[in-house]
Regions:
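Residues that define the transmembrane beta-barrel architecture of outer-membrane proteins
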Residues: 40-42, 58-62, 93-97, 129-133, ...
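Repeated loop/turn-to-beta-strand initiation elements of outer-membrane beta-barrel proteins
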Residues: 42, 74-79, 109-113, 144-147, ...
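Transmembrane beta-barrel strands of outer-membrane/channel proteins
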Residues: 48-50, 79-83, 99, 115-119, ...
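Residues on the lipid-exposed face of transmembrane beta-strands in outer-membrane beta-barrel proteins
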Residues: 46-50, 64-70, 101-105, 135-139, ...
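Short glycine/proline- and aromatic-enriched beta-strand/turn motifs that initiate or cap beta-hairpins
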Residues: 26-72, 76
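Sequence/structural signature of outer-membrane beta-barrel proteins
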Residues: 49-55, 71, 82-89, 106, ...
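Detector for outer-membrane/organellar transmembrane beta-barrel domains
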Residues: 140, 144-193
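Cleavable N-terminal export/targeting peptides
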Residues: 1-40
């Protein structure tokens, strides 16, 4: 019976993995994997990575992340700052800047309220810069499933330098499926349609992740 259940879960994962190629056309940062939900205390984390290679082609890459979390029984909050850059023969090939701050007021009966702000720069990919400010409600549908609904204001500058301000609805659905012992499948779906042009102006993303939990302090995540 257990083998049959695991097989069905694998088929479910493979099916949605096949769909994800088209769904990631407008990538949205997955905040669900960044939460410390239910962990009480103050946490600080600083991580850095540096990679350099010399030869026919010189390659350099660095990334830096600073994170602060402050969680209590009544509220949770976190701030994340990220910066990365990749160069080849002293020419910048990719760079990104990301900042996200969020405050969650924990309510009763599985209904919580949150407010957030986000800023990102990604001039070599989808846009030059994007800033977002929003608020909404977060619902605990089950022990593992979360549903979010709210509003956000978006100010985005595309690769051509054209700026646009848009008010959007924001929806997301997240769940955790246990595939096997210490292995979980974590799909997250985002949908952000324009309030003024619901049918033609929207951003959607389906982010699929598999977590391999090695121990209480270390896990590997595959996207």
């Amino acid at each position: 019976m257990l083998h049959k259940i695991n097989r069905l879960q694998f088929i479910f994962f493979a099916f949605f993995s096949a769909l994800s190629a088209n769904s990631l056309a407008q990538a949205i940062v997955n905040i669900e994997d960044l939460r410390r939900e239910g962990e009480v205390g103050f946490f600080t984390n600083i991580s850095a990575s540096l990679d350099a290679a010399r030869g026919n082609r010189d390659r350099d890459y660095y990334s830096l992340q600073i994170r602060f979390d402050n969680n209590s029984e009544n509220a949770e909050s976190f701030l994340i700052l990220q910066q990365s850059e990749r160069k080849s023969n002293n020419k910048t090939m990719d760079e990104s800047t990301f900042m996200h701050g969020r405050y969650i007021l924990l309510g009763e009966e599985g209904i919580h309220w949150e407010i957030f702000t986000q800023y990102s720069e990604n001039p070599f990919r989808n846009y030059q810069k994007r800033s977002v400010f929003g608020a909404g409600a977060r619902y605990e549908l089950t022990n593992t499933m979360r549903l979010g609904a709210g509003f956000l204001g978006e100010d985005e500058t595309d690769l051509s330098g054209k700026s646009k301000t848009t008010d959007r609805f924001g929806f997301y659905l997240h769940n955790d499926f246990e595939i096997a012992e210490n292995i979980s499948f974590n799909p997250t779906f985002y949908f952000q349609p324009s309030i003024d042009d619901f049918e033609n102006d929207y951003k959607a993303s389906m982010i699929l992740a598999i977590d391999f939990k090695v121990n209480e302090n270390f896990k590997i995540c595959l996207l």
